[in-house]
């Protein structure tokens, strides 16, 4: 085990705080409508330009190990917020930095870190309740477009496209973002289905960067039971190899010899293949397999109806234009099923929904209906250069995540106003323990950080903006950084999803409170480079050359 370098107390916190500041300062320049871009060097290919907080955070690695630990903890805030809400990563980073800074000052002044943490948690709970109380549901397509526009950095066409896509496939529908070959950004609605089963082996992956399996113009084998032996599969595998098309196997499970053979074939390039477990359980699994069979124009291979795996022909397999599989989900796009068959199945499910008395069954039937009838919307992002397309794609993905979050938990006034107004709820909390109260006050001050940063990125003094907003009694009064005017945020369409604001604060406070309570840091000592081999000593006996008159 290699030797470790250990830092304690103030020294540890100072180094950690430096790392937090370096990462947060790089991320927070992107906040708000007048936030700037960050240019990131890539080891190969053109540099990447982005305004997405989590993308910037993930690229930062520092030389000093103690500073790097602080930066990595803050990176965790951005990643967690991105995973849960899909947007709000920069806001979360700004909040975390503000809480860590104030917390470090309080600890240096001799306050108890554990009491500070308790105070931070009490205040955050009050803010979350306040945000949930203020949130109002998204009522119209226009409001969905507003949320998308704000998250896409004021790009109204993107907001409209997302609203259009959601209208077509429903709020629960599947929307994916792809790069377009042309200059235009457009929405394409494709019939399709998504279910929550990922690939059975990572060896099936075709796109190593995204860790996904992508199969085009694919055959789909649907089997009701487990597939474990190879012999029964050979006839259909040989037929698929001759056709030159990829194959997706959906079965109760694929294991043992069958899975091993498929993996070996995939690695040797003989057969482009992937396998996933069938979605659902019991009777519901069978019903979902039948749904997929109808959608893809295939036949469910089931011994109940007298079809064995050995006798399967290509005609019995389903077809789809594209299948995308990641670790957790499978999306089938452009199934070759006949329209009348799909329509008949939809009507059948609708009839079952009306007949059932169980809420759980009704919910599951509605899920199946959405998958069959909803389809998949694809937003194809275009641009003049690859760099521009990637930057725009980041913004579209953020906007899409924000609109989904808005549909789930409603919207609040944007531009940091919801957090600023929540100060009133925190101000009402009083605790007899002075250190717990100091923790509450840390959050009280941190709630101003996002709006200050938005104002400062727009070239306006943050304190003046905060003062003006707090003077006004209207709950929706705020600062429009785009026009540098004070407006009614809801009337102007400057809104944030309540889920994004809530998640940003919860993740920021959770990690920041842990950093504040840190008393020691341990890192590996850098290894000393091995000494170089000594140089050649010259040939012995050559020392008497001095008299040669050189």
Curated annotation (Swiss-Prot):
GO BP terms: protein refolding
Cysteines paired by S-S bonds: none
InterPro entries: Chaperonin_Cpn60_CS, Cpn60/GroEL, Cpn60/GroEL/TCP-1, GroEL-like_apical_dom_sf, GROEL-like_equatorial_sf, TCP-1-like_intermed_sf
Residues annotated to bind ATP: 30-33, 51, 87-91, 415, 496
Subcellular locations according to the entry: Cytoplasm
CDD domains recorded: GroEL
Pfam families: Cpn60_TCP1
Protein EC: 5.6.1.7
Main location: cytoplasm
Highest taxon of source: Bacteria
One Gene Ontology molecular-function label: ATP binding
Entry keyword annotation includes Signal: no
Function of the molecule: Together with its co-chaperonin GroES, plays an essential role in assisting protein folding. The GroEL-GroES system forms a nano-cage that allows encapsulation of the non-native substrate proteins and provides a physical environment optimized to promote and accelerate protein folding.
Family to which the UniProt record says this protein belongs: Belongs to the chaperonin (HSP60) family.
HAMAP family: CH60 (MF_00600)
Name assigned to this protein: Chaperonin GroEL 1
Biological classification of the source: Bacteria, Pseudomonadati, Pseudomonadota, Alphaproteobacteria, Hyphomicrobiales
Gene (name only): groEL1
